[in-house]
Amino acid sequence: MYARQSRVYQDAQLEAVPRIRVVVALYDRLLTSIDAAEQASRAGQIEVRYAETSRAVEIISALARALDFNSGGEIAVHLDRIYRFAIQRLTEFEVRNDPALAQQVRHLIDPLATAWRQLEQESVQASANNVEAPAALRAMRF
């Protein structure tokens, strides 16, 4: 009973969070996982590397599933290509245990995370001024 109530409460909290904050949180966690996987690779910690790489792939997959190609247009198409490439490189990283591949993905994702943080700031300002949300927000469906 308690677990069900807790889940309902968590779901209600998630619905109350603006979707852009969810995207920013996912990107932040993604970067943390990539960094942890790279560090684990350098330290020879195979299990940690695998767990963090798997988490990074799961996050990227969730971001890809959230793309709305109807509303997002070219932005959604480009993000999808980037996500596919990132998953491919992380898979290679896991097989080869080459930290340079993880760094490559980090360098690919970091500007996106920065852009989403900026969009979050713009969204806060826009909502305060009753202005329409940025186009990139329409590329994601949550």
Report the location of each language-model feature.
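Short terminal interaction segments
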Residues: 1-16, 99, 103-142
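N-terminal first-folded block
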Residues: 15-49, 53
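TPR repeat positional signature
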Residues: 26, 33, 82, 87-89
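Hydrophobic/aromatic side-chain positions at a characteristic register within alpha-helices
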Residues: 41, 94-97
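Solenoid-repeat scaffolds in large eukaryotic assemblies
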Residues: 49, 56, 102-105
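Short, solvent-exposed, charged loop/turn and helix-capping segments
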Residues: 62-77
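Glycine/charge-rich, flexible interdomain linkers and switch-proximal surface loops
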Residues: 74-81, 130-131
